[in-house]
Amino acid sequence: MADILKRIEAYKRQEIAQAKQSVSLDALRRQCESVEKPRGFIKALAAKQAEGRMALIAEIKKASPSKGLIRADFDPPALARAYEEGGAACLSVLTDTPSFQGSPEFLTIARQAVSLPALRKDFLFDPYQVFEARAWGADCILIIMACVDDELAGALRDAARELGMDCLVEVHDEAELIRALRLETPLIGINNRDLRTFNVSLETSERLAAKIPDDRMIVGESGIFTAQDCARLKAHRIGTVLVGESLMREQDVTAATRRLLDLPPEAVTGPVHAVLES
C-alpha cells in the first residue's frame, strides 16, 4: 500500500505543479470569492441526526483502481438528484482522474443540480487544492491521515477554515486517530479498509469509535451495504456513513438509497436551505 500511496502522491504533485502554472493561487482566491458561499456540510449531517436518522454522505464515483468501471451510465447531476430524493444528507464526488476517472466538472455540476453540500473526494497534498475545491463548489475537503504528515494536515485544515469549509479527517488505525484528534476538527471518518491487507471489516469502526471523544462526529466508511450495517454502526455512536460503490451499482439509485437508510419508498426530500444557511 505504501508503494500505491507514493505513486498517487507523485502524480498528484505533478498535477498540482501544472495547475499552479495555469492558475495562480491569487487567481484561485478570486474565483473562490465569486462562487456561492459554502453550504454547511456538518450542519447538514447534524440535521439528519437530529431527526433520529442515519446521515448519509452519498458518493458519486465512476470507477476505482481495484474494481475498474463501476457505473457506465454515469450522469453526475442525475445521480445527485437521485441521492437527494433518496434522503442523503451530503454528496461526495471523486475529482481524481488517473485512479477514479473523476473530474472537477463532476463536482461542480452535481452540486449545482441539488441543494446538498458536497465533499471533494481526492488526495490532497497542497493547500492550493483546497482553494481549487472551493472554486469548483466544494463545501468540505478530505484529509487522509495515511497520506500526509501532521504539518501538511494542519495546513489543509487551516486553508479550509479560511474558506469557511468543513473537513472530513480520515483514519484507518489508532496511530492515525491520535494524530487526527490533535487537529481538533469536528468530523472524523473511520475507513474500515485495512491498508495492509485490503480486508474490510466494520469492527474497525466499532473499535476506533470507542476512542473518539463525544464532541466529535464520526463517519463510517467502506464495507457498508445494508440498513443492518447502518444500525450496527449507529449502536456504536456512528451517526454518519459514506457509501458509494454499492449504490453506484444499482439501477434505481433513489430506491437503493432509501433501502440503505431504512426509509419508506415515497419521497423523503424536504426544505433544507433554511437549515444549511442558519
Curated annotation (Swiss-Prot):
GO annotation, biological process: L-tryptophan biosynthetic process
Keyword NAD carried by entry: no
Keywords, sorted A to Z: Amino-acid biosynthesis, Aromatic amino acid biosynthesis, Decarboxylase, Lyase, Tryptophan biosynthesis
Gene Ontology molecular function, alphabetical: indole-3-glycerol-phosphate synthase activity; phosphoribosylanthranilate isomerase activity
Pfam families recorded: IGPS
Catalysed reactions, semicolon-separated: 1-(2-carboxyphenylamino)-1-deoxy-D-ribulose 5-phosphate + H(+) = (1S,2R)-1-C-(indol-3-yl)glycerol 3-phosphate + CO2 + H2O
Entry EC number(s): 4.1.1.48
InterPro entries named in the record: Aldolase_TIM, Indole-3-glycerol_P_synth, Indole-3-glycerol_P_synth_dom, Indole-3-GlycerolPSynthase_CS, RibuloseP-bd_barrel
Annotated metabolic or biological route of this protein: Amino-acid biosynthesis; L-tryptophan biosynthesis; L-tryptophan from chorismate: step 4/5
SUPFAM superfamilies: Ribulose-phoshate binding barrel (SSF51366)
Protein family (similarity comment): Belongs to the TrpC family.
Protein name: Indole-3-glycerol phosphate synthase
Organism this protein belongs to: Beijerinckia indica subsp. indica (strain ATCC 9039 / DSM 1715 / NCIMB 8712)
The organism's taxonomic lineage, starting at the top: Bacteria, Pseudomonadati, Pseudomonadota, Alphaproteobacteria, Hyphomicrobiales
Gene: trpC
